[in-house]
């Protein structure tokens, strides 16, 4: 396992442990994606989080906030000791991502399904501005039971948003149990292809 991924997971566990409650599984399962984006791919500047033309990550499964905070701290967006204030009075790190509180967060997480729609809108705006940014979004597999995900996927394909990359975190779990027992998703890759997306399946 990559050492940075290991550190993201360690800090995530410590972050959640500091408050004693949180979505630990859904946070740990996106460590590799976060590492690749923030350390290898995304054009961002921790010293200037609102930099024009930056790449953006919109975490639609906002309950994975602790992992996002861990990678942001590692990249220098804010001090690591902020991690131990998760969801406490006066914190800048609420349990779900909040763009008005946390440096480096580009969209506030709300009801499941909404974040990806926001990502589609941001990608459209980026095209209009011609700023050459890439917009990334992380979607939960349980979240994919929301119809709004598929409305957004359909629109993105219609608009030919080649500046938008979506990751579905297929960890097979949601708050009420296994995804396939709660509301089976079947072959998610086939569903995305049917909506006009180019799909790659990655282990890890």
Question: What is the role of each PLM region?
Answer:
Residues 158-184:
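A short, conserved beta-to-alpha structural element at the edge of catalytic cores
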Residues 20-28:
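Structural motif
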Residues 5-21, 169-171:
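N-terminal capping segment at the start of a domain
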Residues 12-15, 27-158:
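Cofactor-binding active-site loop characterized by glycine-rich and histidine/acidic residues
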Residues 100-104, 171-173, 190-195:
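Gly-rich Lys/Arg/Thr-decorated short loops/hinges at beta-loop-alpha junctions or inter-strand turns
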Residues 134, 162-165, 198:
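Residues at the starts of beta-strands that form the adenosine-phosphate
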Residues 131-132, 180-204:
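Conserved thiamine diphosphate
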């Amino acid at each position: 396992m990559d050492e940075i991924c290991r550190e993201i997971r360690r800090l995530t566990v410590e972050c959640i442990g500091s408050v004693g409650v949180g979505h630990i599984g859904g946070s740990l399962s996106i460590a590799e994606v976060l590492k690749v984006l923030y350390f290898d791919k995304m054009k961002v500047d921790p010293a200037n989080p609102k930099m024009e033309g930056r790449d953006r990550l919109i975490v639609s499964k906002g309950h994975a906030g602790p992992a996002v905070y861990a990678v942001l701290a590692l990249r220098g967006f804010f001090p690591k000791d902020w991690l131990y204030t998760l969801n406490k009075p006066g914190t800048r790190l609420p349990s779900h991502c909040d763009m008005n509180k946390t440096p480096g967060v580009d969209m506030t997480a709300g009801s499941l399904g909404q974040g990806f729609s926001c990502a589609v809108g941001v990608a459209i705006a980026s095209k209009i501005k011609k700023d050459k940014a890439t917009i990334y979004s992380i979607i939960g597999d349980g979240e994919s039971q929301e119809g709004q995900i598929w409305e957004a996927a359909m629109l993105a394909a219609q608009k030919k948003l080649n500046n938008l990359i979506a990751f579905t975190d297929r960890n097979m779990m949601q708050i009420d149990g296994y995804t396939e027992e709660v509301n089976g998703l079947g072959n998610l890759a086939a569903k995305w292809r049917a909506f006009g997306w180019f799909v790659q399946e990655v282990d890890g």
